[in-house]
Amino acid sequence: MRMYDLIAKKRDGFSLTNEEIDFVIRGFTNGDIPDYQMSAFLMAVYLRGMTDKETARMTLAMAHSGDMVDLSGIQGVKADKHSTGGVGDKTTLVVAPVVASCGVKIAKMSGRGLGHTGGTVDKMESVPGCRTSLPSEEFIAQVNRIGISVIGQSGNLAPADKKMYALRDVTATIASVPLIASSIMSKKLAAGADCILLDVKTGNGAFMKTLDDSIALARAMVAIGTHNGRKVAALVTDMDTPLGRAVGNSLEVAESMQVLRGCGPADLTTVCRELASNLLMLAGKGTVEECQALFDEAISSGRAFETCKAMFSAQGGDISVLEDGSFRKAKYSHVVKAPRGGWVCSTNTEQIGIASVMLGAGRTRKEDPINFAAGIVLNKKAGDAVQPGEELATLYADDESLFAAAERTFLAAYSFGDEAPALPPLVLARVSESEVERF
């Protein structure tokens, strides 16, 4: 078997066999296939696409290129959720404890933030003392004991994906549905969960900007999971505006605790309710309606909040900050005022995320430090009426000199008008193995 022939085969639009796909991924991972040939192969995939079967096999080969997490020591169904990334997206901190409190095990590996999007691991580490790196034995023991553990990605998960992504990044082959889907799902397959709910963000703050593209990505990832024996579904959710009102690590954790205590922002609560109920349904806990009732009861009884505190406590976190919101505050705050009255018609969510990074809440390079107290709290969002000079948001930072540029970026993200805008639904579609349902 020669890589040259497989490049030509894909270039000409033919499907590759399982053996051929395994040869490509294995050879590239171990260094037998050089970058220049893999670059040509990736461009052929970008231009010609892949069938669901090809994509599923490539994803499995990528997953098996490194460590496969063994969750067999955890009793019962193991569930996971994954978000494609957004601004103010703190849903894991609500959904995971709710689902665990309903009797479904959550053994989850999460990522860090990069660019304008935040990461669950960074948010968790804003709780003083919280460890997000656990030995596998402790990770599994904790899930068996309290039903939940959320940690950072560890070990050598899907090294083929890391090498492939580095090439895609410099060869103009990022925006390919089979390549994006296999990149995400290779790590999900390697992480070992039985049930996976995907939260595919769409809109100006998301990686996928249009609903059709987001549904195509969701459908491809669901097909990958199904072909590889996992129960997978996806919700396509709106990211044309930040989720909730807090953007920044400790600010978002505090807001998540409000949701778990039944007093969080309506939009964040609604999205978390839909995600949790769909994940519970995948795990066999009933219909969506029955699982929505489980969500409501887990919140109203306080059980989900107690589960969340138990997780942070088990991982060394100071749970007093979860109970009373006593996170370290930024040294300085700055109020951004509305330049005119009327209505907030739209927001450029990516720019709001960039403004939070400028304040120190995120990173532009993987090695950048994060200020857990920095960020933005939004007073006005798309669809809100506003008076001239009224507070739009409060910016938080430890360096006053950061406010001027961040405020300019933030204000440029806001569009005002004289009439109330029509807003899209928070959940725009549900994708399962058998259908795509638009809302």
Task: Describe every region a protein language model picked out.
Residues M1-G88, V259, K309-A314, D318, ...:
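Acidic, glycine/proline-rich low-complexity segments that act as flexible tails and inter-domain linkers
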Residues D5, K10, S15-N18, F28, ...:
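Well-ordered secondary-structure scaffolds
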Residues L47, L93-A107, K187-G192, H227-N228, ...:
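Alpha-helix C-terminal capping segments
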Residues V77-A100, V104-H116:
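Glycine/serine-rich anion-binding loops at beta->alpha junctions
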Residues M109, V143, I151-S154, I184, ...:
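Short beta-strand segments
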Residues N144-C195:
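Phosphate/diphosphate-binding glycine-rich loops and adjacent basic-rich segments that engage nucleotide
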